[in-house]
Regions:
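Transmembrane beta-strands of outer-membrane beta-barrel proteins
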Residues: 34-38, 83-87, 120-122, 142-150, ...
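Short loop/turn motifs that connect adjacent beta-strands in outer-membrane beta-barrel proteins
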Residues: 24-33, 79-82, 129-143, 212-222, ...
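Residues that define the transmembrane beta-barrel architecture of outer-membrane proteins
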Residues: 32, 64-70, 116-120, 142, ...
Length: 331
């Protein structure tokens, strides 16, 4: 079991046990309200591999490679305050492939990756719009919020050896790989450098929350949330700068460093020589493999379903969300 899955399972156990712990303890001090739930999302990536090769643009996403994921959610806010605080643990998968790019240079480069990541995010949210009312015995509310904060991300890019790779037959014969096998790229040092598996990111985005309380004081919350992550790394896709010296790599690392081959050249296209996409012995300026001036980004759009774990007094619940006098039916 890899580290990402272990962290997710541990967090799931903690969230499952949390309601029982809260019930067993006295109410939180200073009127804090707590809610916990599960989330599902789709995730995309923007970096050195894209639909058209435009960095940091949502339209550059390869939409057919968007991946699904799940997460755990915990939110707390102090009664009467507008700011809420969120703790989220998400399993996020991103993926990209030059073979699906409309950019001819990227197409011939023929690199690809997938990255199964674990994100631990601490964010704050601020309501931009709040609406509410009643429907029968239910108290309903809508909140449109701005959200932002910091996150710790564990990532591990992987790739498979292309069956058209010039080294494929030799690698399979020697037992370095099998058909369809995914390999960890960071340990293979495909650009001759090391990079961190834990990085800091900045999630920022918007959310809309629908709240429904059947009269128990413990409302349900359904949230639609979209978050964009700003990162300081250019290695989520294992593509950063230039082709590295193959003599300093393992055979498998060499295969992943350059996956370009003659079979990738489009017919009738005026393309550079295949040597453009590999290390040049004795050259003072090596061929560019990626854009070192940019940083990778990723995003998620998903739904969270959560339930309040601590009771909110009915009167306080109304006063907090709905301004004005309460009207009682005297009849």
């Amino acid at each position: 079991m890899d580290l990402s899955r272990a962290l997710l399972i541990a967090a799931l156990g903690a969230v499952i046990a949390l309601p029982f712990a809260v019930e067993a303890q006295r109410p939180l001090p200073s009127g804090w309200q707590l809610e916990a739930g599960l989330s599902g999302h789709v995730a995309g990536y923007n970096g050195d591999i894209g639909h058209k090769g435009r960095y940091g643009v949502l339209s550059d996403t390869q939409w057919h490679l968007v991946q699904g994921g799940v997460g755990l959610h915990l939110r707390g806010h102090q009664r009467g305050k507008r700011t809420g605080f969120n703790l989220d643990i998400r399993q996020i998968r991103i993926q990209g492939a030059d073979s699906a790019s409309n950019n001819a240079i990227a197409f011939v480069r023929n690199l690809h990756f997938r990255n199964e990541m674990t994100e631990i995010a601490a964010t704050a949210d601020w309501p931009l719009l709040r609406l509410g009312g009643r429907l029968g015995g239910w108290t309903l509310g809508h909140q449109f919020r701005l959200q932002g904060g910091f996150a710790l991300l564990h990532h591990a890019p992987q790739a498979r050896v292309d069956v058209d790779n010039l080294c494929y037959d030799v690698l399979t014969e020697l037992g370095y790989t099998t058909h369809g096998q995914w390999h960890d790229l960071r340990s293979l040092r495909t650009e001759g450098i090391d990079y961190a598996e834990w990085v800091m990111t900045v999630p920022i985005g918007l959310s809309w929350t629908f709240t429904a309380d059947p009269g128990t004081g413990k409302p349900w919350h359904i949230t639609l949330r979209g978050l964009w992550r700003i990162t300081r790394t250019d290695h989520l896709d294992d593509i950063h700068d230039r082709y590295a010296d193959p003599w300093k790599m393992s055979p498998l690392g060499l295969a992943f460093s350059s996956q370009a081959n003659p079979d990738d050249l489009p017919p009738c296209a005026q393309m550079p020589n295949i040597s453009t996409y590999q290390y040049q012995q004795g050259s003072n300026s090596q061929a560019i493999r990626g854009n070192a001036d940019t940083r990778d980004a990723y995003w998620t759009v998903g739904i969270t379903v959560a339930k309040s774990l601590t009771s909110t007094p009915t009167q306080a619940f109304h006063k907090q969300r709905f301004r004005g006098h309460r009207v009682e039916n005297k009849r």
